[in-house]
Amino acid sequence: MEKRNVYFLTEQKINTLLELHQTGRYVEAEKLSLSITKNFPKHQLAWKVLALALKQNGKISESLIAIQKSVQLEPRDSNAHYNLGVILQELRRLDEAEVCFRQTIKLKPDYTEAHNNLGFILQELRRLDEAENSYRKLIELKPNNAEAHNNLGVTLKELGRFEESEACYRKAISLKPNYVEAHRNLAITLVDMGRLEEAMSNYTKVIELKPHLPQSLQDLAGLLTSYVPHEGFSNPVVKVNEEIKKNYLKEKTIGIISDNKIIKLFNQSTSVIKKYNLKIETQSCQAFRQNSINLNCERHMKVFNEFNIIPKFCFGCYKVQVEPTTILELIKLLIVLDQIKLIKNNIRKCMVEMRPEISGFYKGLIYCSNLEEAYQIANYIEILVKENIGSKMNIIVKRGCSEYPIAFPDYKEINSSESKLMKYNEKWKLIEEDYDLLNPLKSKRIITPTLTGLNLQDILIIRNWIDYAKGIGDPSVHLLKQNTIFSQKIYNKAKTRLGKYKER
C-alpha cells in the first residue's frame, strides 16, 4: 500500500513537472526535478527535464551532467540523445555533438531537428558536402520547410555553387514570402554574382519587412559603395547616401584640403543621418576603393594562420603604405585616394590599425602587383600628399601582409635583386590546393569596382576612426565634435594600443 502511495505521488509530481516545463516556468521546473531525481535517481524523464530546465536557467555545465544521466538510463531515447547534442553544440564540442545527432537519427530516422542540427555542425566543421546531404535529407522529410531550403542555400553558397544557392533561397521565399533571413541571404548571393539591381530589390524587401535590422542596413550601405540605384528604390539608407555624395561633390576643391573643409563635410554628413533618423553603425575600420580584382586576402590570412605558410599569391603582392599622423590627415588621405587616377585603378584603403601585433595607428595602403609599380606609385603619392594635404607623411613600400615577416623575417626584405628575396616554398603548394578544395567560395565572387566620391559607408567608418582617435589621445579629434562613442570596442582597443605603441 505504501509503495502505491509513493508511486501515485511521483506520477503527480511528473505531471506537474511537465506542465512547469511546457509553460516556461524553468526555475520551478529545476527545483521540482531536482527533488524527484534525488528521491528517484533512476527516473529518466526527470533527469531529462532537469537538463532542459538547467539549460534554460543558464547552468549549461550542470545541464550536461543531467542529460548524460538521462541518456545513460535510457540509451534508446532519441530525444535524450538530441538534447545532449544540443548542449554539446552550445559548449562548442562539435565532434561529440555530431555523434549525438547521428545517434538520434539512427534511433529515429525522421527526426527532422536532428538532421538540421547535424547540417549546422557539419557546416561549422567545414565538411560541406556532408552538410549538404543532411539538409537534403531534411527537405525529403519536410519539403515545405522554408528554413531547410534556406540552410541548404547557405551551404551551397559556401561550396561556390551560387546558382543552386540562389534557387534554394527563392524556394524558401516562395514557401515563406516574408522570410527576412532568406531575402537577405539571397541579396548577399546576388551581390557575389554581380547582379546588384536584383540584390537591391531584396535588400529593399528586407528593410520593408524589418526596417531596423542592423546587419541589413550595413549590407545596403556597403552595396551603395559600388552601385547607383534607380529612382524606384527609395529608403532612408539610399536617401542618406545620395545626399552625402551630393554634398561631397559640392565641396570638392582643387589644391590643399583644409581642416575646415573636412570638418564641414563630416558635420554635413552626420546631419543628414540625423535628419532621416537612420540608426546605422558598422564595426569596420577600413574604407576601401576597390577595382574588379579579388585579392582574396581573407583566404590568404586563413591559410597563413592555419598552416603557418605564406600563400604563393602573396609573394607577388606589394603595397605602398602612407602614415598620416592625425585623424584629420587620415580623412584627407581618404579623399586623395578616392580621387587618385591610377592606370590599373589599384585597390587602396585607409584604416586605423587594430591588430595587436602590428605597430602604427593611421594608415593608407595601395596594393601593387610588382615592386617597380609600387615605387612609381609611392613617388606619385608623395607628390599628391604634398599638393593636397600639405604635410609630410612617411611613405614606404612593403611586401604582403604585415603579419608575414613576424613569422618569416626574410619575407620583409625588398630589393630588385633576386639574391636576397625570399621565394615561395613549393612544398606549400599541396597544402594550398587541399585548402581550396575544402573552401571554394571566395575565389568565385564577382567584385564590382567602387564608385568615386564620399559615401555613407565612409562616414560610418570615419565615426569609428574618431572613436579610435579618442582612444589614442589624438589632440585634433575634438575638432570633429563627435560626442558619442559609436564603438566602445574600438575605443577600448585603441586605448590598449596607446600604451603599447606610443610614439617614441
Each predicted region: which residue ranges?
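Alpha-helical segment of the N-proximal tetratricopeptide repeat
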Residues: 9-39, 49-52, 56
